[in-house]
Amino acid sequence: MSAEVWTFILVTVSFMGYLYIGWRSRVQDSKGFFVADQGVPAIANGAATGADWMSAASFISMAGLISFLGYDGSIYLMGWTGGYVLLALLLAPYLRKFGKYTVPDFVGDRYYSNVARIVAVIAAIFVSMTYVAGQMRGVGIVFSRFLQVDIGTGVLIGMIIVAFFAILGGMKGITWTQVAQYTVLIIAYLIPAIAIATVITGIPIPQFAFTFSDIVEKLNQVQLDLGFAEYTAAFTNKTMLDVLFITIA
């Protein structure tokens, strides 16, 4: 069978698995919908969070950004990852402690202020819409390549699938679906990384290939041949103030 047929089979099987998990995880009360009955194990929650991070934005955009910008792309990676860490340490634990389901409810009750609640609502909407726009664009690109449709149709298909998980299973369905996606994404990352490392350096472990071979020098030379700065050159076209604000943003 051709690579296209194998791709179709594997993607179809994985999607059928996601749909089955979403159906089995359907909920009937608000606690199950918003906080997955507070019964998801820590390891599963970690896997789901990892799958969220390894989303379309990371899998497509972040990988391309670092590949194109080299060391300069690390400022986006550090800011993005740092935001996840701050959220996990400074906000997420206290939502459960306060018994709240949403960030605006928590902020409003914590600071006894409806103004703070409104500010939290505006911030949540702004951040969510910005993130979702990039995510859905990535979903549209993936479906357009896979189903041979235009990107707009791919976005619509992705919206329908996401709505199915969110409406039927709430956070419980989304969490367990993300756990399954985590496994798929890890494998999808490892296969090309191992293959490229083996072909270029003969070392099948990407971390060792990057450390103990001349792959960095080759990347630097490719960048120079294309008229760009070296792959490992740090912040060649940015001031430290630019770097600081991009990382914070």
Predicted regions and their residues:
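Loop-to-helix junctions at membrane interfaces in multi-pass transport proteins
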Residues: S2, D37-V40, A44, S61-I75, ...
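Hydrophobic alpha-helical transmembrane segments of polytopic
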Residues: A3, T7-S14, A44, Y76, ...
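Transmembrane helix-loop junctions in multipass membrane proteins, especially transporters and channels
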Residues: W23-S30, A92, R96-Y101, F143, ...
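Membrane-interface "cap" regions at the ends of multi-pass membrane proteins
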Residues: M1-F59, A166-G169, P192
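Membrane-embedded alpha-helical core segments of multi-pass
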Residues: V13, G17, S58, G83-L90, ...
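Alpha-helical transmembrane segments of polytopic integral membrane proteins
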Residues: R26-V27, A56-F59, A63, A88, ...
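Helix-loop-helix module between adjacent transmembrane segments
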Residues: L19, G50, S74-G169, Q221, ...
